Structures are given as structure tokens and as C-alpha cells.
């Protein structure tokens, strides 16, 4: 099931161990505002998404919001950018934080987010630094 009219999709990239309710809520609200479908790509060790996502996935089903879910063992920043740029229906990419994805990067000298042709939404709650 997709929204009527021009197809738009929000791409949500989730890292196992970094599932934050604000991240999921941000993606959901963005989909509602844009009347967009939701495509979820999850980095996880197993074949199932992290259990912290169960309530969120149930909400999507209950509200009949169109979504797809793919669980992958690895996912690089560059892969997300290339994928989003190759699919013009991707309206935005939602991640927890640039810093979190930076930690996964093998080549930290590049910044593939700069090449992203749609908005990048970072939705993590920043921890306060104590001085």
C-alpha cells in the first residue's frame, strides 16, 4: 500500500543498539507531514530488527502506514547516500546522528553526506557534556 499521487519515501536508517524513540518518532512525523511511505534499513547482527523497534512497527501496521523493512549486517554512509541519490522518490534520510555513523566509517576522511541530494534529518538526543 502506498500513498496516492506522487510517491515520496522517507528513508530511515537504524543502527542496532542505537534505537531511540525520538529517531523513530521523527521519521513517523515526517512521513505524516509529507504523506510519504517509510523505508526502513536496519543494521543488525541477526535477521530480525531489534526488539526495541517492535512497538514502532506495530504502530505503523495499526495506522496502515506504508512501509518496507530490510535488515542488513552492514550499511555504510556512502551506501545510504548512493541509494538515496539513485532513487528520486526518497524525500529525506533520517538517522540518529552524523557522529554515530562516523564511528562506523572505514574512511573518515570523506564526508558522503555532503553529496546527499535530499535533506538529512538527524534525530538523536544529544547528551549534555559536563565541564
Model-identified regions with their sequence ranges:
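Small/aliphatic-rich secondary-structure junction motif
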Residues: 2-54, 63, 120
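General small-molecule cofactor/ligand-binding pocket signal
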Residues: 39-41, 68-72, 121-123
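Short acidic active-site motifs
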Residues: 52, 76-82, 108
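A glycine-rich helix N-cap at a beta->alpha junction
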Residues: 55-74
Amino acid at each position: 500500500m502506498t500513498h496516492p499521487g506522487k510517491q515520496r519515501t522517507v528513508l530511515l536508517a537504524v543502527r542496532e543498539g542505537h534505537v531511540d524513540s525520538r529517531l523513530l518518532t521523527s521519521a513517523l512525523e515526517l512521513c505524516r507531514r509529507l504523506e510519504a511511505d517509510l523505508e526502513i534499513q536496519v543494521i543488525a547482527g541477526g535477521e530480525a530488527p531489534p526488539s526495541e523497534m517492535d512497538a514502532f512497527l506495530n504502530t505503523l501496521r495499526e495506522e496502515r502506514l506504508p512501509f518496507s523493512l530490510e535488515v542488513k549486517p552492514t550499511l555504510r554512509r556512502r551506501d545510504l547516500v548512493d541509494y538515496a541519490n539513485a532513487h528520486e522518490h526518497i524525500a529525506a534520510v533520517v538517522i540518529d546522528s552524523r557522529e554515530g555513523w562516523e564511528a562506523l566509517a572505514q574512511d573518515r576522511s570523506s564526508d558522503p553526506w555532503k553529496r546527499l541530494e535530499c535533506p538529512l534529518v538527524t534525530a538523536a538526543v544529544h547528551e549534555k557534556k559536563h565541564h
